[in-house]
A protein has these predicted regions:
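Extracytosolic helix-loop segments that constitute the early lumenal/periplasmic catalytic or substrate-binding loops
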Residues: 27-33, 44-71, 75-90, 169, ...
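Short acidic/glycine- and proline-prone juxtamembrane loop motifs at membrane-interface regions
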Residues: 40-42, 147-158, 327, 483
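Hydrophobic, aromatic-rich transmembrane alpha-helices
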Residues: 117-118, 278-305
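Catalytic lumenal/periplasmic loop and adjoining terminal transmembrane helix
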Residues: 242, 357-517
Length: 524
């Protein structure tokens, strides 16, 4: 009985490129141009801001506490710094420059996915070619991958290196392959790069090591060469980190000491050991997480020698013993697991073998279609509500040669108590300037105090800083900011960053206030 007949959309090849990879490329292109902001703050504070400082646009002493603690590897920031430098050569707008970084990220993920599907046999024995093709389709069209393909976070960066690793092991360490020392050395190097892309990927290397020893029965000589390759790559990145931090540093050791020994990570929240098992079935973010959990659970019994089985459970249990848990921590492995889903579909088909397979697996076609639909929606949807507004105001400033002054809240960092803006400094430009609440308070004291009057606060700050356009995120729902009290301000938008209720008041400029109000509401 045939498990899966590829629908017309995915049937055949266009040249040597499979249509589902073309779909992934399309989602990546859309994400580059339409997906503004980031999925998680770490994407900026630990990567883009670091890269921005590396190319000389930002200040090292204004980076997040991770820089002072010297716990962040510089591999991905330098990966982002090169296209970022090119982007700022083309335009001084950060909203243009970041597109170059997203484009490189999307291209890298596409190359890694293509290599994995071409070289890795997914290490799931018993799947026929059609089922393997289905696994590739499910991977390339998954909502999680579509959502992150044009991101710059470490989760998708690590997932791309994992796919390269799985493709390499599939090509060189299959059951019919003879092991060679050079293959083990380069495998170790690849693991070293993956480890410095995200330190939690050490669980993957541990799983691979035990798999090579127990299942593949690699010799101690070959395993030692593998470790040598890992150490060689690690040494290169230790030197890079030491150069960027201005002194010898082993960032993995610092990371472990800060987050595990000192418990800094736990200050962001702790969860019981079983939290991930609960989230598999309840979290809306983990699209397909329950299916991955069910499939990999079955694989423990029916495919215990599968490398993916070892990697998945090492990764899950390794993260389960750490007190601080976030669903995104599992993304690097969950992104890859759809290639295993056809195994579950095959088991179901055997249970209902008396039913025509075309009728049994019509839900598979629906799953692919729905994944594509949601993937496209995700690619078009801006990630950060406030960044769409910032980009728009930046364009206003450039068109009218005016400055936009931003006043936003700050948040405490858990380790040192330093305060950094919620919106990264990366998005500041000659047309987007910053004023902090403490500056406003100081100005109030010098003028005899007007802290109880939000309208006078806005008026005074705008007048003293002399911006032609002023943007405020003051914590107030007071709509009394009218033309009578703010007649020296060209543009005021109140409480836009922290609220979905937008109050826009337009003075002097040719911007249509009603249109801006509707636009801002639509973006938020």
């Amino acid at each position: 009985m045939q498990l899966y007949k590829p629908p017309l959309l995915f049937n055949g090849l266009i040249g040597n490129v499979k249509p589902h990879l073309l779909y992934l490329a399309l989602v990546g292109v859309i994400g580059v141009f339409f997906s503004i902001g980031y999925l998680y703050p770490d994407e900026h504070f630990q990567i883009i801001e670091f890269a921005n400082a590396a190319i000389g646009r930002g200040s090292f002493d204004k980076l997040a506490w991770e820089y002072g603690s010297r716990i962040r590897p510089w591999l991905q920031p330098w990966f982002a710094a090169i296209p970022l430098k090119l982007g700022f050569f083309v335009s001084d707008s950060p909203f243009v420059a970041i597109k170059f970084v997203k484009a490189l990220s999307a291209f890298f993920v596409l190359v890694a996915t293509s290599y994995f599907l071409r070289c890795g046999n997914y290490d799931v024995d018993g799947l026929n070619p059609k089922e393997r093709q289905l696994g590739g389709v499910l991977l390339a069209t998954s909502v999680l991958l579509s959502q992150m393909v044009a991101s710059t976070n470490s989760e998708i960066f690590a997932a791309a290196w994992l796919m390269l690793l799985l493709g390499y092991t599939g090509r060189n360490f299959g059951p019919d392959r003879n092991e060679k020392s050079a293959q083990h050395f380069w495998c170790g190097c690849l693991n070293g790069v993956m480890f410095f892309s995200r330190f939690q990927m050490g669980f993957v290397y541990a799983a691979l090591g035990f798999w090579l020893l127990v299942i593949r029965r690699s010799s101690l000589k070959h395993l030692s060469i593998n470790v040598l390759g890992f150490l060689t790559a690690s040494l290169a990145f230790v030197l890079l980190d030491s150069y960027m931090y201005g002194g010898f540093v082993v960032t993995p050791a610092n990371y472990f000491h800060a987050n595990i020994i000192e418990g800094v990570a736990s200050r962001f929240g702790i969860s019981p050991w079983y939290a991930y098992f609960f989230e598999f079935g309840t979290s809306g973010r983990l699209v397909g997480g329950f299916l991955s959990f069910a499939t990999l659970t079955v694989m423990v019994f029916v495919r215990p020698k599968s490398l993916l089985t070892w990697i998945f459970w090492f990764f899950v249990f390794g993260h389960s013993v750490v007190a601080h848990k976030e669903e995104r921590f599992l993304f690097p492995v969950l992104i890859v697991t759809p290639v295993c889903w056809p195994l579950m579909f095959g088991l179901v088909s055997k249970v209902v073998k008396k039913t025509d397979s075309g009728k049994v697996f019509w839900p598979v076609r629906v799953l692919v279609a729905v994944s594509c639909l949601f993937g496209l929606i995700t690619a078009f949807r801006p990630r950060g509500q406030k960044y769409g507004v910032l980009e728009y105001l930046d364009s206003i400033g450039r068109a009218q040669h005016q400055a936009v002054c931003l006043d936003w809240d700050v948040k405490d960092q858990p380790k040192s108590g330093e305060r950094v803006p919620i919106v990264p400094a990366f998005y500041q430009s000659p047309y987007v300037q910053v004023m902090f609440p403490q500056d406003l308070d100081h100005a109030n004291k010098r003028t005899g105090g007007c802290a109880d009057d939000p309208a006078r606060q806005v008026w005074y700050t705008a007048k003293k800083t002399s911006p032609e356009v002023y943007f405020s995120s003051l914590k107030t729902s007071d709509a009394s900011l009218t033309c009578q009290t703010t007649n020296n301000i060209d543009l005021v938008i109140v409480d836009l960053i922290s609220s979905d209720r937008v109050h826009a008041f337009i003075h002097k400029t040719g911007v249509n206030g009603e249109q801006l109000y509707l636009w801002a509401c639509r973006r938020t």
